[in-house]
Amino acid sequence: MTKHRVVVGLSGGVDSAVTAHLLKQQGHEVVGIFMKNWEDDDDSEFCSSRQDFLDAASVADVIGIEIEHVNFAAEYKDRVFAEFLREYQAGRTPNPDVLCNAEIKFKAFLDHAMRLGAEKIATGHYARVRQNPATGLFELLKGLDPSKDQSYFLHRLNQAQLSKTLFPVGDLHKTEVRRIAADIGLPNAKKKDSTGICFIGERPFREFLNRYIQHAPGPILDDRGRKLGRHVGLSFYTLGQRQGLGIGGVKEKGAQRGAGDHAPWFVARKELETNTLRVVQGHEHPWLLSHRLDAQDASWIAGHPPAAGACAAKTRYRQQDAACTVLAAQGDAFSLQFPEAQWAVTPGQSAVLYDGEVCLGGGVIAAVNG
């Protein structure tokens, strides 16, 4: 195995810690970098960056590597957070983790690592990279642990980025990662996984978004046009949402709806022109199901779109691959047709294409059709 100078993104979590350990065990020259990418709430109870850095520094000490603290807050706010807000203001539901990976972890961080003389970078993502011997192209593969696979969030990476990237824990299951961490005495072996917005942390989302986006309350209507209540602003809702609608006590009587007295309500549409939130009763309501989507701002790992034909796709993280047909893929736009109806396909989220375990790339969902 060729030995490299590898810069590892140490987040303070167990996955990146084991990543650094494995690389050092393989004989690589390993340096750690802790990225601070959000500083608006440094004194907030929800900001964990101080503790995360202390955890990362403790890990570096146990493993025996140097660690550097680097601030990418300006880049994050300009390249990721500004787009995140624009999408919400346009009534869509963005996925900041996808953009953060493409713009910060595998661009700003990669560039910084190269300036430090790195030959490779590594992160604790559950994914894999291989070079196809027939084409010479680098491929992004799903992580071996299906419950932790993060290729969905990495689908915007390109050939240059993948050629410089290592994902050591992509060949492991999470239980193995925690066992390794415990065996070598890492102080964060039992630290829980983070689940908040990329780099912003775990905080009440509506309260957080309210600080940055103007909101206009409006009516909540059902599929018949009946008024059920008022929403607090369309930006605060996403398609398929069930909790937090404030209409839990409004139940439709009668069997004619086919949903029953106590069937839950789901967000089905956001009508920006009239500032109206549309909700429907029942998980399988036709308004929640679609067979086709159109996507834009596509990025293809091989550098070109896949040919029209049979494929598989995810329209949300952790979703099982859904069989589909690529109807057209030209430039940065493509369309998919699904033989089985997909539930709550959401504009702003990513549609990511797969050929078996190989991630082909994807784009941002722009429109859906029944």
Swiss-Prot record:
The active site is at 100 (nucleophile), 198 (cysteine persulfide intermediate). One of its GO terms (cellular component) is cytoplasm. Disulfide bonds join 100-198. SUPFAM superfamilies: Adenine nucleotide alpha hydrolases-like (SSF52402). The record marks 125, 349 as: Interaction with tRNA. The keyword Transport does not apply. Its EC number is 2.8.1.13. Pfam families: tRNA_Me_trans, tRNA_Me_trans_C, tRNA_Me_trans_M. Residues 148-150, 316-317 are annotated as: Interaction with tRNA. GO terms for biological process: tRNA wobble position uridine thiolation. ATP binds at residues 9-16, 35, 124. CDD domains: MnmA_TRMU-like. The keyword RNA-binding applies. Keywords: ATP-binding, Cytoplasm, Disulfide bond, Nucleotide-binding, RNA-binding, Transferase, tRNA processing, tRNA-binding. Its main location: cytoplasm. GO terms for molecular function: ATP binding; tRNA binding; tRNA-uridine 2-sulfurtransferase activity. It catalyses: S-sulfanyl-L-cysteinyl-[protein] + uridine(34) in tRNA + AH2 + ATP = 2-thiouridine(34) in tRNA + L-cysteinyl-[protein] + A + AMP + diphosphate + H(+). Belongs to the MnmA/TRMU family. Catalyzes the 2-thiolation of uridine at the wobble position (U34) of tRNA, leading to the formation of s(2)U34. NCBIfam families: PRK00143.1, trmU. This is tRNA-specific 2-thiouridylase MnmA. The lineage of its organism: Bacteria, Pseudomonadati, Pseudomonadota, Betaproteobacteria, Burkholderiales.
